Structure formats: C-alpha cells, structure tokens
C-alpha cells in the first residue's frame, strides 16, 4: 500500500516463507521496474537490519517486482560457473516466483497475473 516501507514488504515476505517451514534465499531480491527491467529500489525477500519501518516507502504510481526465492533449509546461494544459475548451498529443492505490481490510488494491481 502507498506509504508502506519496502522493508515492511520484505519482512512480510520473510514471515510468509518462514511460517511454512522454509527459508528465503539470501542476497537476491525483487526490484523496481520502469524504463529498465531492473531499477531501484531493491526489495529483498527478508528483512535487512532490524527495523521494518525504515528506508524508502511505496509511492503512488510505482511499479515493482517481488521475487520470493524459497529454500528448504539453507538460504545460502551458490552461483554456477555460468554466473546465472543459482542453487542453495545444501542442494535441496528451491522455488522462485516473480510478480510485477503497480500501485495507484492506494490499490495494487498484479500485472503478471494471466
């Protein structure tokens, strides 16, 4: 919602993941999207620091992607030699979703829904 800190969103994503017995993949994040596919702000799938009510806020007209990356046990990333493929350190199954959202008039529209 408009006025919410992006860290609050990160914290909610992490709580959702952990409540189901999983952990987020660290070091990767969602992002703003506009003239370029990856723009500020970065939106981690976990709370960085200890204050969710800090940092940039969601503003009317923003478009951004959230990208929950979910691991079974170990959220430590290992990037392959191709510099793109990534797995969790323990090699167990992981999952990655991406949704693009637009915020306007205090409403959110998920643009990536078919």
Can you describe what each PLM-predicted range is?
Residues 1-114:
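Active-site neighborhoods and metal-handling regions in enzymes and metal-associated proteins
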């Amino acid at each position: 919602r408009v006025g919410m800190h992006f860290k609050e969103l990160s914290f909610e994503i992490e709580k959702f993941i952990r409540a189901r017995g999983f952990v987020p993949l660290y070091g990767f994040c969602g992002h703003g999207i506009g003239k370029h596919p990856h723009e500020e702000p970065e939106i981690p799938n976990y709370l960085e620091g200890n204050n969710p009510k800090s940092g940039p806020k969601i503003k009317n007209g923003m478009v951004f992607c959230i990208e929950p990356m979910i691991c079974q046990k170990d959220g430590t990333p290992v990037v392959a030699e191709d510099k793109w493929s990534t797995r969790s350190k323990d090699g167990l199954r992981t999952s990655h979703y991406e949704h693009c959202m637009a915020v306007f008039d205090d409403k959110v529209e998920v643009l990536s829904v078919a």
